[in-house]
Swiss-Prot record:
Protein name (Swiss-Prot/TrEMBL): Sugar fermentation stimulation protein homolog
Listed InterPro entries: SfsA, SfsA_C, SfsA_N
Record-stated family: Belongs to the SfsA family.
Gene name as annotated: sfsA
Domain of life: Bacteria
GO molecular function, one term: DNA binding
Pfam families for this protein: SfsA (PF03749), SfsA_N (PF17746)
């Protein structure tokens, strides 16, 4: 489990704005502006009136020492809105040998430069007796019609990552797109063709080329976050959306 130390503190969300900032009010009535480590649309994750949970940094140089970590929605779901946690969570689960699909590697390297488009891979797994495994981690928090969708906004960077992963397979390596589902209401995942059509098309191409897609849910609470169970990727969702157009 990734434990929050010191413990997270609750507050009520007033407004998220300028992508990286949010205004909140603590139970004691103190108004704070906190940092939001999420560049996405955060659809359904930032409704005014939601209970949010924040951490506090001991770095005196930070202008906004508090960071928004979790949202507890008014419907009872938990969401991790800090996208920086996704890589940390997947790396921790790999080190603890909790992901069977990614077991058997001796070394884990982070943020390694690679590819033809000046990219950095989130995680690179290596072992003497197997191919290098390149892992790109994506945080999934958009819930619509009982399904989790990625991305929640058009992502040219995400499109680039799919091209890079496909090239890794062409060059003889193993490549994995790992969807870290950080919304407890999501039980299945699909590409958001209605938001970023090109990303959905590239995902199909990448899978056909041999890129693996793995989706896992996580248990979330103010105490910490822990890997839960594997979730399905809806292939039929891609095909039906394509055929309907």
């Amino acid at each position: 489990m990734l434990q929050f130390t010191p413990p997270l503190q609750p507050a009520t969300l007033i407004l998220r704005y300028k992508r990286f900032l949010a205004d909140i009010v603590t139970p004691a009535g103190e108004a704070l502006t906190i940092h939001c480590a999420n560049t996405g649309a955060m659809t359904g994750c930032a409704t005014p009136g939601d209970t949010i949970w924040y951490s506090t940094s001991d770095n005196p140089k930070r202008k906004y020492p508090q960071s928004w970590e979790l949202t507890q929605t008014q419907t009872g779901d938990w969401i991790c809105v800090n996208t920086m946690r996704a890589n940390e969570l997947v790396n921790l689960a790999i080190e603890k040998n909790q992901i069977a699909e990614l077991s058997g590697y001796n070394f884990v390297r982070k943020e390694v430069k690679y590819g033809e488009e000046n990219s950095r891979i989130d995680l690179l797994l290596q072992a003497e007796d197997r191919r290098d495994c390149y892992i790109e981690v994506k945080s999934v928090t958009l819930l619509q019609q009982q399904c989790g969708y990625f991305p929640d906004a058009v992502t040219l960077r995400g499109q680039k990552h799919l091209r890079e992963l496909q090239n890794r397979v062409v060059n003889g390596h193993r490549a994995v797109l790992f969807f870290a589902v950080l919304h407890t209401g999501i039980k299945q995942v699909a590409p958001a063709r209605h938001i970023d059509r090109r990303y959905a098309e590239l995902l199909v191409q990448a899978q056909q080329a041999g890129v693996e897609v793995i989706c896992y849910g996580f248990q979330l609470s103010p105490d910490g976050i822990e890997l839960n169970t594997r979730l399905p990727l809806l292939q039929d969702e891609m095909l039906s959306s394509e055929n309907a157009e």
